[in-house]
């Protein structure tokens, strides 16, 4: 940890095809072993598939899916006097996006379709319709936070 100054977060380059920062971040999260071109191919194929299936513009469906998966609150463990409490805390905007993208990718990897592009397209279309595993994950996190509302005063 630097002692002199706080180092700012690096700005990632926008997506070359659509010019979207969110899509560039999504490609980076999907990427495995540094294979960015493969990840881009998967995402672009998934977006094309989404356009064919839904008839809407792919970027708007992608953003709607992200919006439906973004968590507003989450729980963090906090140790107080020998016992651990799950304390509900609000999620910062950058983390909201990161969690939503991570959950979409995880849910897509668990699906049964043949190619990753088809799985990703299916999961994003489901998320845009407020269905699917990623949306269920968000609702589980919200439910946990709601159940532990009594410990909200332990926030730090």
UniProtKB/Swiss-Prot annotation:
SUPFAM superfamilies: Ribosomal protein S7
Organism: Photobacterium profundum (strain SS9)
PROSITE patterns, per the entry: RIBOSOMAL_S7
Protein name: Small ribosomal subunit protein uS7
GO biological process: translation
Pfam family, one: Ribosomal_S7
Job description of the protein: One of the primary rRNA binding proteins, it binds directly to 16S rRNA where it nucleates assembly of the head domain of the 30S subunit. Is located at the subunit interface close to the decoding center, probably blocks exit of the E-site tRNA.
GO cellular component, one term: small ribosomal subunit
Single Gene Ontology MF annotation: tRNA binding
InterPro entries: Ribosomal_uS7, Ribosomal_uS7_bac/org-type, Ribosomal_uS7_CS, Ribosomal_uS7_dom, Ribosomal_uS7_dom_sf
Subunit structure as annotated in this protein's UniProt entry: Part of the 30S ribosomal subunit. Contacts proteins S9 and S11.
Tree of life domain: Bacteria
Protein family per UniProt: Belongs to the universal ribosomal protein uS7 family.
Keywords recorded for this protein, A-Z: Ribonucleoprotein, Ribosomal protein, RNA-binding, rRNA-binding, tRNA-binding
HAMAP family recorded: Ribosomal_uS7_B
């Amino acid at each position: 940890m630097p002692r002199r100054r706080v180092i700012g977060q690096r700005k990632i380059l926008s997506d070359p095809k659509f010019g979207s920062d969110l899509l560039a971040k999504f490609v980076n999260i999907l990427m495995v072993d540094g294979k960015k071109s493969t990840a881009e191919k998967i995402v672009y194929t998934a977006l094309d598939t989404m356009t064919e299936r839904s008839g809407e513009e792919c970027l708007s469906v992608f953003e709607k899916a992200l919006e439906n998966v973004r968590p507003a609150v989450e729980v963090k463990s906090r140790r107080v006097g020998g016992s651990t409490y799950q304390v509900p805390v609000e999620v910062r905007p950058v983390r909201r996006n990161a969690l939503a993208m991570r959950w979409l990718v995880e849910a897509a990897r668990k699906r049964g379709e043949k190619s990753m592009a088809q799985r990703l397209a299916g999961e994003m279309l489901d998320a845009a319709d407020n269905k699917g595993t990623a949306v269920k994950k968000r609702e589980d996190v919200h439910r946990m936070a709601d159940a532990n509302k009594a410990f909200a005063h332990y926030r730090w």
